[in-house]
């Protein structure tokens, strides 16, 4: 119920700005209190709302992170941040899949894009959704091993970035979520040793599947613009 209300309110805000959820919203962050219990309800409600906005497996979804989050009011079970751009056109947007590494999200019942690349006249922005240690069948890889999961997570992100002609070196900011604070030092050590130039922070926030010990989202920027489009 709360998820539906949040999306309906946001759709109204977009309408007032002459925008739509399908055409202009490029990224969402959904923060779920007690994600292990409440995430399925959020997934169901989002899917229902998306169906009313022509966001389906035949069209497209929105890059997103669904993660543990809390509000000062304990009766608020879900909050959402969003990013939308007015004046953007469909030709500027490309959705990223990396099918050799990951499956399509709707195959296991959720509705978000793995990544979205947006090309402007002078640059390209790449939004990578919350990405974990998953394979092309939608299964958890390296269950119980946070370091191997971190390695596979980075491999998946590299594959998504590659589709947008970007690399890890193009990442401007990244957030790494861990389920257990006991894993902080090991994950930090691994990232610092293997990816010393990565601009990141680590946050304690359980991922939407209990078996995923770590997840990362990021935003990359490259100079690969297209003069057909405005430099918004």
Where are these regions (language model features)?
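N-terminal presequence-like segments and the immediate start of the first folded domain
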Residues: 1-173, 177-232
């Amino acid at each position: 119920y709360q998820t539906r209300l949040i999306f309906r309110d946001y759709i109204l805000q977009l309408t007032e700005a002459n925008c739509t959820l399908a055409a202009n919203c490029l990224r969402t962050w959904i923060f779920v209190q007690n994600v292990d219990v409440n995430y399925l309800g959020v997934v169901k409600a989002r899917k229902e709302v998306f169906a009313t906005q022509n966001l389906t497996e035949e069209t497209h979804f929105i890059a997103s992170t669904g993660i543990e989050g809390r509000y000062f009011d304990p009766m608020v079970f879900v909050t959402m941040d969003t990013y939308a751009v007015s004046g953007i056109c469909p030709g500027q947007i490309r959705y990223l899949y990396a099918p050799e590494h990951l499956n399509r999200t709707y195959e296991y019942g959720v509705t978000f894009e793995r990544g979205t690349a947006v090309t402007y006249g002078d640059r390209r922005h790449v939004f990578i959704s919350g990405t974990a240690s998953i394979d092309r069948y939608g299964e958890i890889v390296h269950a119980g091993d946070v370091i191997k999961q971190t390695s596979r997570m980075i491999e998946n992100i590299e594959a998504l970035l590659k589709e947008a002609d970007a690399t890890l070196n193009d990442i401007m900011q990244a957030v790494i979520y861990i389920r257990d604070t006991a894993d902080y030092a090991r994950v930090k050590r691994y990232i610092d040793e293997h990816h010393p130039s990565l601009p990141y922070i680590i946050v304690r926030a359980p991922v939407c599947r209990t078996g995923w010990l770590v997840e990362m989202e990021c935003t990359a920027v490259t100079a690969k613009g297209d003069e057909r489009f405005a430099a918004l």
